[in-house]
A protein has these predicted regions:
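Surface-exposed, polar helix/loop patches in the mature regions of secreted/periplasmic/lumenal proteins
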Residues: 101-139
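Sec-dependent bacterial lipoprotein signal peptides
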Residues: 1-28
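Mature extracytoplasmic/luminal segments of secretory-pathway proteins
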Residues: 15, 25, 89, 97, ...
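A sequence/structural signal for flexible, mid-protein segments enriched
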Residues: 29-32, 112
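N-terminal pre-ligand scaffold of iron-sulfur
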Residues: 31-107, 120-121, 140-155
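Short regulatory "switch" loops immediately downstream of catalytic or recognition motifs
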Residues: 1-2, 93, 127
């Protein structure tokens, strides 16, 4: 093995390393995700049995149901499609919880009673933002996993 081959090989490895490090440093971003200041984090886990008649609406795509016992103002469960379920906080995310901040279900939407903000249950996004408000938050999403006939909802 000659010396020029070793030098060329080492130079290629150094160049690869420099390119990789440049990519890593350029990829870093100081902008962080803005956490919703109105609704603090909650710690919970519960399950529901989809075989019970109470949860029949969740057996169909687009079906939704409000469960009042968890979350700030309850949790909305939504059947996105056959095996994909979503769980959303039922409290309007754009102000402190109060007497009118619980959202109401409107088919595949939920609406904040205070400002009539409407949110998609498929994405959690605000559908009718107000031009005067600068910080508008989506619904808070909770985790859902399927275990047999049970949905386990957690945060």
């Amino acid at each position: 093995m000659n010396l020029s081959y070793i030098v060329a090989s080492s130079f290629k490895n150094i160049m690869k390393f420099c390119v990789l490090m440049t990519y890593i440093f350029v990829s870093c971003n100081k902008n962080s995700v803005t956490r919703n200041p109105f609704l603090p984090e909650l710690d919970f886990e519960f399950s529901i049995n989809l075989n019970l008649p109470l949860y029949d609406n969740l057996k169909f795509t687009g079906g939704s149901l409000l469960i009042n016992d968890f979350g700030h103002k309850g949790i909305i469960l939504y059947n996105l499609n056959y095996n994909n379920y979503l769980a959303w906080e039922a409290s309007c995310p754009n102000h402190n919880p109060n007497s009118c901040s619980k959202t109401k279900l409107l088919g595949v939407l939920t609406e904040c009673v205070c400002e009539n903000y409407q949110y998609s249950l498929a994405t959690g996004q605000l559908l009718n933002p107000s031009p005067k408000d600068t910080n508008q938050y989506p619904l808070i999403n909770y985790g859902v996993r399927i275990s047999g006939n049970n949905l386990i909802i957690y945060n």
